[in-house]
Amino acid sequence: MAKVITMGEIMLRLSTPNNEKFIQADEFDVNYGGGEANVAVSLANYGHDAEFVTAVPDNEIGECAVAALRKYNVETKHIARCGERLGIYYLESGSSMRPSKVVYDRAHSSISTATEADFNFDEIFEGADWFHFTGITPAVSDAAAELTEKALIAAKKHGVKVSVDLNFRKKLWSSEKAQKVMTNLMKYVDVCIGNEEDAELVPVSYTHLRAHETTL
């Protein structure tokens, strides 16, 4: 089985129980997750050697997030303890014709302020086969975008294949900022995943995508 590294933000999700609206709820259900973390969990469930790299605050909430990953046999040994807080999002679960709602509270989270100095990327990518990230991580902050590129440089140095899920989030950045940042990061990418709307943000030709599609 492959050794796969994913990197991104793990968040605390507070969701209303029983499809209640925010205004009705007196309590929230607690879960931890994130796009890249969920990929690591899925890969671990399929028997792969999956590791998730992130930063969490050095407090009990941060440790709860790490413990949530360990429950699913995701490697967490390179998670940094730094920064002020874990990002939070509130979920109002939809019901019938009423759609779900999400409210984010992730500004100044640990991963958004983390730097290359908080990680040993040479150690992280030693012996790895694959590195996966999404467009969410570089969208979180300029520091996170820089951190993502440092990770990509280290991954390629160690001969690691790289995949990206473009996953454009308009609440995090503009399409102009996304295009500028992601265009720069695409030079490190072997496999690009995205829908037509996502693909418009970066200059990846259809031929390029098809070439990678045939290798999957």
Locations of the language-model features?
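Short, contiguous strand/loop micro-motifs
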Residues: 25-27, 52-53, 106-108, 138-139, ...
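Generic secondary-structure signature for well-ordered alpha-helical cores
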Residues: 12, 16, 70, 74, ...
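Conserved beta-alpha-beta core of the PfkB/ribokinase-like small-molecule kinase fold
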Residues: 136-209
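Structural motif
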Residues: 5-7, 130-132, 163, 193
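Short, well-ordered, mixed-charge alpha-helical segments that flank or form enzyme active sites
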Residues: 14, 99, 111-114, 139-142, ...
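Glycine-rich phosphate/adenosyl-contacting loop at the front of the ribokinase-like
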Residues: 1-77, 115-116
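Single conserved hydrophobic/aromatic residue that forms the stacking wall/gate
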Residues: 208-216
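Conserved N-terminal subdomain of the carbohydrate kinase-like
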Residues: 49-135
